[in-house]
Amino acid sequence: MSADNESRTGRRAAGGGTSNRQWWPNQLNLHILHQHSALSNPMGGDFNYADEFRKLDLAAVKKDLHALMTDSQEWWPADWGHYGGLFIRMAWHSAGTYRMGDGRGGAGSGSQRLAPLNSWPDNVNLDKARRLLWPIKQKYGRKISWADLMILAGNCALESMGFRIFGFGGGRVDVWEPEEDIYWGSEDTWLGDKRYSGDRDLENPLAAVQMGLIYVNPEGPNGEPDPVASGRDVRETFARMAMNDEETVALVAGGHTFGKCHGAGPATHVGPEPEAAPLEDQGLGWKSTFRSGKGGDAIGSGLEGAWKPNPTTWDMGYLKVLFKYEWELVKSPAGANQWLAKDVADEDMVVDAHDPSKKRRPMMTTADLSLRFDPIYEPIARRYLANPEEFADAFARAWFKLTHRDMGPRSRYLGPDVPAEELIWQDPVPAVTHQLIDRQDIAALKGTILASGLSIADLVATAWASASTFRGSDKRGGANGARIRLAPQKDWAVNQPARLATVLQALEGIRQEFNNAQSGGKQVSLADLIVLGGCAAVEQAAKKAGHDVTVPFTPGRADASQEHTDAASFTVLEPVADGFRNYQKAKYAVTAEELLIDRAQLLTLTAPEMTVLIGGMRVLNANYGQSKHGVFTRQPETLTNDFFVNLLDMGTVWQPTAADKDLFEGRDRVSGELKWTGTRVDLIFGSNSQLRAVAEVYGCADSQEKFLNDFVAAWNKVMNLDRFDLA
């Protein structure tokens, strides 16, 4: 067959065709549990980024970055001969996708270089910033990730323009495929805003106002130039990104001290974004046919101009101009709503970025003007204007928080520029300064705990409640710190406060008795004791099933204080649902099984790990409220594979108890006798074909030992998710 004939037959490559997801749009997405495997990572399984970063000459990298700032390239000329504004925007937009609702987004994975972020409208022309960085990345290779380099470039941009930064911590590890677990919104058009309902209520966990934007629409809500209404959007969005009003004003005013917006001509001249660009453009997008398409002819956001004179110098110009002048609404050359200062003094005129013979009036976006006209922002901005040192410190701290918020505790930061000051948003836990318990102590404490009168279910549920707050997204939560004994965690409904208080009181008594009996400085923390209690309970439950297993335990956790716990910031860690405890706080638009997958992904669990944990937690009787839903066993608190055996039993017929199909009854197929009750979370392991395949492994007659070993391994993983000292 000729090549032409073969082409006409419509031959297709592997991976094409109608996908399962297209056939069944509501199919459970288990792929998010199996992202970022070694199969997609070119660095190899032995690569340790932290070790490589420690070999890096950070001072040399910074020197090269400083030199780059003024090394203007013909293919993408620097505004005023300085790339500082471009790199600040790149770093800001890398970090600015973070939202505290689920901890996802942020700068920690270098995802700006991948879809969809590399092609968001708000990231227009940041592809050029990353290409400008490529020679430096190429030079230092594996010793610095793209994720770290993008933030470091933003820091060096600030320094090169006269600003003193707060510090820098390395340690961000690149991913090699898009982060598909992140819900960016349900809109199917750029700048769509289906995420709102009611009186501009923004859908959780989203923070940005429209699809493809990092923060707010700079022209105002839905493009309407209303500074007061914009202030409401700014406050909501920045709050969801973990910033208070003072931090918000500092970030906006500080960031807009530098650089300019680009809107030299109509957006119709701009070509497709990087993911849609033709092959020959080699990953660069937004090619413009407007004149030269670059420099003074560049088209980006559609807004045009700089906020203040001297856009490559740190000074108070932004706030001075903001309050000094009245502002008139105009259209940019690209047709965007923006504001220009009226009757501008010559000293405040802005020299054109590419033609020093021309001067421009300062501009503001509608969002900028919210700092002047919002009743809360305005006095903060005026205070900063009157106190330059306070403003500089506020911006430095807010910028550091912005760029490090998703990295977890300070102990994860790498490099010589990590600031010494410990900040409350880092969820500080005291250093362990005492001698740790040894193997004999561990065995003795296990015996004491099991003899305390606390049940296996009590101990398992408490250890799980403590450890499972961890979020792999922003590395918050976990058992270290024992914050389960502090507000707000001790009062969360999912933790059954009365029962929790009883368990903690008993464990605290054991802790005090043990510590008081020591003479050589050896101590045990409550954080360690909570986890140890869970491990002892799992071992006891396995013993009841006729098996001797040892659950790994490594001491070294410490107890945090209420003083060093920002209770308000911890409220977002409260589970709206925890399928592992068969808990759901309320009725939601998404199904219980989808919420389970979401939580499993935050716990960095695979589908097999999630499956074996569910089966074990059910027979351990660890449900919220001691409910019997999903407890498919006649011998609770005994670690068997009964959950899987009975779920897969064809002698049982399942029917929903109500129209909402949230709760189900399992009856004997012949007699109709009620055998079990279960939730959607329980039944999904028999319904979903992929999860059923895994469940069948654990339901086999010869699987008890494998079930035990796999459960212990998954349990140990969850208990140690925040033990970064063990990595």
Swiss-Prot record:
Cofactor annotation comment: Binds 1 heme b (iron(II)-protoporphyrin IX) group per dimer.
PROSITE patterns named in the record: PEROXIDASE_1, PEROXIDASE_2, PEROXIDASE_4
A GO BP entry: hydrogen peroxide catabolic process
Top class in the EC scheme: oxidoreductase
Cofactor(s) of this protein: heme b
InterPro entries cross-referenced by the UniProt entry: Catalase_peroxidase, Haem_peroxidase, Haem_peroxidase_sf, Peroxidases_AS, Peroxidases_heam-ligand_BS
Covalent cross-link Tryptophyl-tyrosyl-methioninium (Trp-Tyr) (with M-241), where: W92-Y215
Site keyed Transition state stabilizer: positions: R89
PTM statement from Swiss-Prot or TrEMBL: Formation of the three residue Trp-Tyr-Met cross-link is important for the catalase, but not the peroxidase activity of the enzyme.
Alphabetized UniProt keyword annotations: Heme, Hydrogen peroxide, Iron, Metal-binding, Oxidoreductase, Peroxidase
Record GO terms (molecular function): catalase activity; heme binding; metal ion binding
Functional description taken from the UniProt entry: Bifunctional enzyme with both catalase and broad-spectrum peroxidase activity.
Subunit record text: Homodimer or homotetramer.
Protein name: Catalase-peroxidase
Annotated gene: katG
